[in-house]
Amino acid sequence: MKKKIIIFLLALSPILSFSQEKELFDLIISDENATPELLPERMVFTQRIFWGEKGLLRKTGIAPLNLKNREKELKLRRSFLKTHQILGYATLGTMIAQGIIGGKLYNGDNSLYKTHKTMGKVVNAGYFTGAALSLFSPPPLTNKKTKGFSSIKAHKFLASIHFSAMVLTNVVADDNKKAHKAAAYTAFASYATAVIVFKF
């Protein structure tokens, strides 16, 4: 009886082996046919407008959504964000200079008015160029929600504060000196903190 069971199992083993190989082969085929996720589920609205599946760059054919283009986009993203970081440090320096000039202007040194206006344009150019590089960079490959505190979450939260403060600083520049000063200090404090938080 035992011999019959052993012979039966030996006879059955090639069939079982073939069946397992077929299942494995089917899995490989289905994996090869699967479309890899090229875009993250979560994207900033500005990224979705340009780089999303139905974004402007996809619809116009400038950047069709495929693996080769996504590799190029990720390299472009890296250079955008590196430039964003460098501009961030430079802009922080110009903000400090603008704060010193602005302080002297508020203390009655009216000879610095034109310098203050010019420096304001320099700060704005650096700030809004840096912001655009971040907001319009191609999206990452994945963008999962993480629990708890992280430096990137703090950086993004502070960005919403300093962006609003920068816009307000420009809106009230000529009409309300007190509001202009308060908005400028808020922009500087939140911006400097965002730079420090992201560094550490």
Residue ranges and their predicted role:
Residues 1-21:
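Bacterial Sec-dependent N-terminal signal peptides
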